[in-house]
Amino acid sequence: MAASVLNTLLRRLPMLSLFRGAHRVQVPLQTLCTKPPSEEDSLSPVPISPYKDEPWKYLESEEYQERYGSRPVWADYRRNHKGGVPPQRTRKTCIRGNKVAGNPCPICRDHKLHVDFRNVKLLEQFVCAHTGIIFHSLYTGVCVKQHKRLTQAIQKARDHGLLIYHIPQVEPRDRDFSISHGAVSATPPAPTLISGDPWYPWYNWKQPPERELSRLRRLYQGHLREESGPPPESMPKMPPTAPAEASFTGQTDPQSAL
């Protein structure tokens, strides 16, 4: 029994010595009192653009010409996505606080570009020159936030008369816009109505053959009163009856039937 207790103490002796050695380490008070740097301080802030008040001057500078040239700012941009099929909408925003997402959109990647209704040269790059339609965000690659700002700035620039678009005039073709076509002109009357013939040919009177007439005479001998000629040109018109007389006759007919 005593041997087992002694072995247990010998096993725990090195652990106790290490624990005591750890307490003997001196830690300076300065390291314990200083605050750890916050995430906002550790991250580099977004640089401030010198063209914030006058953003149109950046598009006239040599720096812009060296970087973009005569092409739009979104010409060389390629979206970064997972898989072979790109998502059907761009990201909501590229900058959240001081954090800039990887591969930001063409507007967010250059801090000197500012969406403003007075920056006409920048807005013209996102509008079709032929139709005046704003390019879709999937075509230009800008995020949803910047696309919304672009749409508002373009509409405001049009209201102020700064941004206009020209639609070329196309001369209409005579064949497409002619009013002499049969489908758009007055319908002429049928030739049969002009000549006085009936609309359908089987309504016209035709003299039956003499052989057929002789057969019918033999068949209905003694029952035929007289031979009828061609039908009259116009049927006799019946005199119109007054509504009161018609209602009176309609009421008296059932009584007479009884």
From Swiss-Prot:
One of its GO terms (molecular function) is structural constituent of ribosome. One of its GO terms (cellular component) is mitochondrion. SUPFAM superfamilies: Ribosomal protein S18. The keyword Ribosomal protein applies. Residues 1-35 form a transit peptide. It holds the Pfam family Ribosomal_S18. InterPro entries: MRPS18B, Ribosomal_bS18, Ribosomal_bS18_sf. Gene3D superfamilies: Ribosomal protein S18. One of its GO terms (biological process) is mitochondrial translation. Coiled coil: none annotated. Keywords: Mitochondrion, Phosphoprotein, Ribonucleoprotein, Ribosomal protein, Transit peptide. Residues 248-258 have a biased composition (Polar residues). Residues 218-258 are annotated as: Disordered. Residues 229-242 have a biased composition (Pro residues). Its main location: mitochondrion. The keyword Ribosomal protein applies. It comes from the Eukaryota. It is found in: Mitochondrion. The modification Phosphoserine is found at S38, S49. Belongs to the bacterial ribosomal protein bS18 family. Mitochondrion-specific ribosomal protein mS40 subfamily. Component of the mitochondrial ribosome small subunit (28S) which comprises a 12S rRNA and about 30 distinct proteins. This is Small ribosomal subunit protein mS40. It comes from Macaca mulatta. The gene is MRPS18B.
